Amino acid sequence: MNINYWLKKAIKKLSHCENPRYEAEILLSHVLKCTRIAIIINQEIDLSKEQYQKLNNFIYRRSIGEPIAYIIGKKEFWSLSLCVSYKTLIPRPDTEILVEKILSKVNKNFRSILDLGTGSGAIALALASVCSHWNIIGVDNSYSALKIAKINGLKLNLKNVEFFYSNWFSHINEKFHIIVSNPPYIGIKEIQSLKKDIFYEPFNALISKKDGLLDIELIIQKASQYLFDKGWLFIEHGWKQKLKVQYFFKKYNFFCIQSFKDYGGNDRITFGQKK
């Protein structure tokens, strides 16, 4: 069976997906170890038996909802190819906006950044790749996630970032110019309305009590203790949570509070400055 014939079959099996052709080509490029462009211009090439079997297994897994990032074990974020596993959230394109906003606020005096709940290390590594003079720390309460983050750091050869265990601020003993977090912010009542793909991701990195706001408030409440004066706190949150998150920032004495939308036009990021 050649690439063209397999691709047509795969697209039919993935017809319920948002972009079946793109997803089928991603799986092909992973198995054949080539670019999507190479696949497009070489569709008459025959697949080996081993390649055919692996591709069919991948298509089945995708057809029942497993995210492609977990199937191939990687996801691109901020032009970085990151390893991911079932123990880490899959980095989203919308979170790149968080990185952009942090970069817009930094100045020559900023030297230290803390990424709370780092997961695969996406935010910390994206920042480290841009500013080699910063000292960046990523923490997580999952040793499995930290293992993936460390693998990504080594693979990318980024020397100015380190990862270690901390349950939010539990093991933090210093102050930072910037603290950033993409914490769990989905409420328990929202679970049934989620796409089935999301159920493959670690629930403790997704779900938070008090309508998804428990961890967000805890972080905002404690962040001032770990920020230098005039330091910034950046939080990613749910699209209906902007007003509540802004209220928490005001309640815990932050100012210059701003919120920004994601690529879909939904409120997604709020940040404020320590007084």
UniProtKB/Swiss-Prot annotation:
* InterPro entries associated with the record: DNA_methylase_N6_adenine_CS (IPR002052), HemK-like (IPR004556), N5-glutamine_MTase (IPR050320), PrmC_N (IPR040758), RF_methyltr_PrmC (IPR019874), SAM-dependent_MTases_sf (IPR029063), Small_mtfrase_dom (IPR007848)
EC code: 2.1.1.297
Q: Where are the transmembrane segments?
A: none
UniProt keywords, alphabetically: Methyltransferase, S-adenosyl-L-methionine, Transferase
Would you say which domain of life the source belongs to?
A: Bacteria
A GO biological process of this protein is: methylation
Query: Into which EC class is this enzyme placed?
Result: transferase
At which positions is substrate bound? 182-185
Q: Which residues bind S-adenosyl-L-methionine?
A: 117-121, 140, 168, 182
The cross-references to CDD domains, in alphabetical order and at most eight, read: AdoMet_MTases (cd02440)
Spell out the coiled coil positions from the record.
none
Give the catalytic activity: L-glutaminyl-[peptide chain release factor] + S-adenosyl-L-methionine = N(5)-methyl-L-glutaminyl-[peptide chain release factor] + S-adenosyl-L-homocysteine + H(+)
* GO molecular function terms attached to this record: nucleic acid binding; protein-(glutamine-N5) methyltransferase activity; protein-glutamine N-methyltransferase activity
Per the entry, what this protein does is: Methylates the class 1 translation termination release factors RF1/PrfA and RF2/PrfB on the glutamine residue of the universally conserved GGQ motif.
Q: What PANTHER family would the database entry show?
A: HEMK METHYLTRANSFERASE, MTRF1L RELEASE FACTOR GLUTAMINE METHYLTRANSFERASE
Q: Which family does it belong to?
A: Belongs to the protein N5-glutamine methyltransferase family. PrmC subfamily.
Protein name per UniProt: Release factor glutamine methyltransferase
Question: Species name for this entry?
Answer: Buchnera aphidicola subsp. Schizaphis graminum (strain Sg)
Gene that produces this protein: prmC
